[in-house]
Amino acid sequence: MKAELIELIARVIQVLQINIRWMTWNLFLAFIPLVLSVWLFRRIKRSRSSVWWFGFAVFFAFLPNAPYLLTDVIHLIDDIRTIQSVWMITLVLIPVYLIVILAGFEAYVISLINMGYYLHRIGKTQWILGMELITHALSAIGIYWGRFLRFNSWDFVTQPDAVITQGIEEILGKQPLVILAISFVILTVLHWLMKRVTLGFIRQGCTNIANNSSKASLKPQTSDE
């Protein structure tokens, strides 16, 4: 029994060591658009220079990497077959995958919240929903290109011809269109849910800060005589 447990733990550690490489890399790619969204949409400066537009293009090129982590659930299925222990799968494997996938998708949600904040600030609040839906559609295409055609974000620069020709040709088939439609619905629903959860936490935090500030200002001050 002890030997079997040691062997099982060693197998779990081996699986996690293999996964930590692509998990770290995919999370790094997912947080690039999040950082860019802060720089693009949260700055006080309103002018949109050529550098801003370049950053905006890079932002959209890397943005699908954040929800792309949802598709990494296929690795979880392979790992479950490898480990074959209900307890290790439940207590170790699934929580690790949930943290990584949720972190990536939360980066996507916050990036869109930042974009919506920017549109509201420049007086284009009515564009927010449309831009979110367009972003979901483009991200669904990006996820398909990444998962099935193995394109990367930087392929827009290194091999733009292949991305445009092969990428567009591939998504016009019946099966790809079904996959894109399902991906679009999943992104839309999950974003809608997590956006409200995220904004709820933000508002709760702001309320707590405001309440603490009010209590501090109403607290009687004593003076030394």
Label every model-predicted segment.
Residues 3-30:
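Hydrophobic transmembrane alpha-helical segments in integral membrane proteins
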Residues 17-25, 91-93, 152, 164-188:
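Membrane-interface transmembrane-helix boundary segments in multi-pass integral membrane proteins
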Residues 32-42, 102-119, 184-204:
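Transmembrane alpha-helical segments in integral membrane proteins
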Residues 40-51, 117-127:
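Membrane-interface helix-boundary motifs at transmembrane edges
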Residues 50-91:
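A glycine-rich, hydrophobic loop/mini-helix early in the fold
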Residues 53-64, 131-148:
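Hydrophobic alpha-helical membrane-insertion segments
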Residues 141-163:
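Juxtamembrane non-transmembrane "cap" segments at the membrane-aqueous interface
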